[in-house]
Amino acid sequence: MASNVTNKMDPHSVNSRVFIGNLNTLVVKKSDVEAIFSKYGKIAGCSVHKGFAFVQYDKEKNARAAVAGEDGRMIASQVAVINLAAEPKVNRGNAGVKRSAAEMYGSSFDLDYGFQRDYYDGMYSFPARVPPPPPIALAVVPSKRQRISGNTSRRGKSGFNSKSGKRGSSKSGKLKGDDLQAIKQELTQIKQKVDSLLENLEKIEKEQSKQEVEVKNAKSEEEQSSSSMKKDETHVKMESEGGAEDSAEEGDPLDDDDNEDQGDNQLHLIKNNEKDAEEGEDNRDSTNGQDDS
């Protein structure tokens, strides 16, 4: 396993360093890069970053051989951009402008991985991931023109127009026939559903009307029973009042007879008392006469 150091700034290291761009680093790992580039010579260092990688060889000739052999290779479904780090490929926007290694790296600046990443992101324009496939264009069916009825003699070639018209009409007739059949089937299904719904509604209405009639009958029966009960109660009250009056009328003559009997008894007692008084006076008179004699 090679080291991760690929940022040495001495001229020998810079000239023997290979840059791999447009690399799908989500799939390709450090071991994969080493396996691909180790066949060109001994690898002193290898570093993998987001979207690109560096391979540091011991010799410049090995680096140039790797660039010549691997540039444009398909790695993980992406075309890799491979060149020497000291001789980067000029971007299309900067065509014709050459930049030296001193301008790119600096003479006395110690590069780190962050600087390398920012620098090469600006130097090379490549996607970090596999670009999405272009959308599949759906087949567009051209709309058919309606056939204009009229005199065919006005057109150029009547025979050719009639044949093409027949072909177009036959195709459109087939399409229309299929469409009509499908529409008819859908309409029949809809009609069946509507009929079933109407039947259910009629059943519900009939049940509701029956329930209403039953409720009305029950109410009328209750009213009749309550009215009959009231009539019976009034009749009973009237009978009870009439009986009381009759008993009162019957009781009056008895009271009169009792009163008459009591009067007769009193008169009889008075008469007896008078008789007793008279007899007592007579006895007194007789006793007085005897005494005088």
Swiss-Prot record:
Residues 177-225 form a coiled coil. Residues 16-87 form the RRM domain. Residues 206-222, 229-240 have a biased composition (Basic and acidic residues). Residues 242-263 have a biased composition (Acidic residues). GO terms for molecular function: identical protein binding; RNA binding. InterPro entries: hnRNP_C (IPR017347), Nucleotide-bd_a/b_plait_sf (IPR012677), RBD_domain_sf (IPR035979), RRM_dom (IPR000504), RRM_HNRPC/RALY_subfam (IPR051186). Its main location: nucleus. The keyword Coiled coil applies. Keywords: Coiled coil, Nucleus, Ribonucleoprotein, RNA-binding. It is found in: Nucleus. May play a role in nucleosome assembly by neutralizing basic proteins such as A and B core hnRNPs. This is Heterogeneous nuclear ribonucleoprotein C-like 2. The gene is HNRNPCL2.
